[in-house]
Amino acid sequence: MSLKEKTQSLFANAFGYPATHTIQAPGRVNLIGEHTDYNDGFVLPCAIDYQTVISCAPRDDRKVRVMAADYENQLDEFSLNAPIVAHENYQWANYVRGVVKHLQLRNNSFGGVDMVISGNVPQGAGLSSSASLEVAVGTVLQQLYHLPLDGAQIALNGQEAENQFVGCNCGIMDQLISALGKKDHALLIDCRSLGTKAVSMPKGVAVVIINSNFKRTLVGSEYNTRREQCETGARFFQQPALRDVTIEEFNAVAHELDPIVAKRVRHILTENARTVEAASALEQGDLKRMGELMAESHASMRDDFEITVPQIDTLAEIVKAVIGDKGGVRMTGGGFGGCIVALIPEELVPAVQQAVAEQYEAKTGIKETFYVCKPSQGAGQC
């Protein structure tokens, strides 16, 4: 049973009438451009065919009823006439409440809604299940009430909800790609202007995501430290962000910087350049060059930004040994565990899966999870 059929069926059972619309918003994987988002740089994600699906219908009052199919059909209910505050027990409900609350601040011309939510974006794998939920809820209200909001505004609304209502710091990439993703394309995003450019993906290439299942413990504290180090670097160059520093300017004075800050800055500057070049390599179907750029990105994250762990490095090495120069592989996400992403010719996927199954657990004691994805369409009706 598809997520659409599942949510429509649950909706009719729970609320006693059929849903009028079914909306989806996808998760994402970032192909290249790591920790560049909060430095006003470039990222190159694609939406994936794992998504959050919501069957819904407008109400003729100001009540919102939401059922979470993946949390034992828990039901949340709140009114648009009262101040929206956090739910005491249901964390999932706060993503919904936050999106609705921030949407009210943007455009209050919507009424009540009934929703049933289900998704298959793996949680805790760094594939943006939360952004996919935020964008899905925003799209529901935009579609049901014909709100004059574009994808970028729905994305910004989701980011605000996560930062200010849920209380998690995040950049804008995850929500933007979920809202604006294009089938068979990646999206080059300028995190300063929020400008986007669709980049066609070569035919016959699979997007493979492998979760190391190494439990991330340092990610919060280390993320904040990296952010501070980047801000220190920008201040040294008297620029608003590292986006504004050239590699030539850096090389001329690198010896004057604190050695650790210098390494962090070098990663951001080289990663930005790699990301822009990767977009044109992909567009030209040059998988060999894309693979080189992904390998350089991984080495930079390992040696300069120091956010990989041995388990992730092992996983990347196993994949690289199979694909050679026919594709690319690197860690993706915040670091200290999580996933690797690989661009692999479809005919090599079984060999990669077999090599990883035979070697990764033997070397690390952890069993991986393997996802084969397609670059998918952003949020909309399904």
Swiss-Prot record:
Catalysed reaction, written as an equation: alpha-D-galactose + ATP = alpha-D-galactose 1-phosphate + ADP + H(+)
- Enzyme class, broadest EC rank: transferase
Give the site residues for Transition state stabilizer. 28
Active-site annotation:
174
Single Gene Ontology BP annotation: galactose metabolic process
From the Swiss-Prot or TrEMBL record, state where the protein is found.
Answer: Cytoplasm
What positions does the entry give for ATP binding?
124-130
Tell me a Gene Ontology molecular-function term this record carries.
magnesium ion binding
Q: Which pathway does the record list?
A: Carbohydrate metabolism; galactose metabolism
Question: Could you say which residues bind substrate here?
Answer: 34-37, 223
InterPro entries attached to this UniProt entry: Galactokinase, Galactokinase_bac, Galactokinase_CS, GalKase_N, GHMP_kinase_C_dom, GHMP_kinase_C_sf, GHMP_kinase_N_dom, GHMP_knse_ATP-bd_CS
Q: Does the entry feature the keyword Magnesium, yes or no?
A: yes
Pfam families listed in its UniProt record: GalKase_gal_bdg, GHMP_kinases_C, GHMP_kinases_N
Primary location group: cytoplasm
Q: For this protein, what is the EC number?
A: 2.7.1.6
NCBIfam families recorded: gal_kin, PRK05101.1
Please give the family membership noted in the entry: Belongs to the GHMP kinase family. GalK subfamily.
Give a short account of what the protein does: Catalyzes the transfer of the gamma-phosphate of ATP to D-galactose to form alpha-D-galactose-1-phosphate (Gal-1-P).
Which protein are we looking at? Galactokinase
Lineage per the UniProt record: Bacteria, Pseudomonadati, Pseudomonadota, Gammaproteobacteria, Enterobacterales
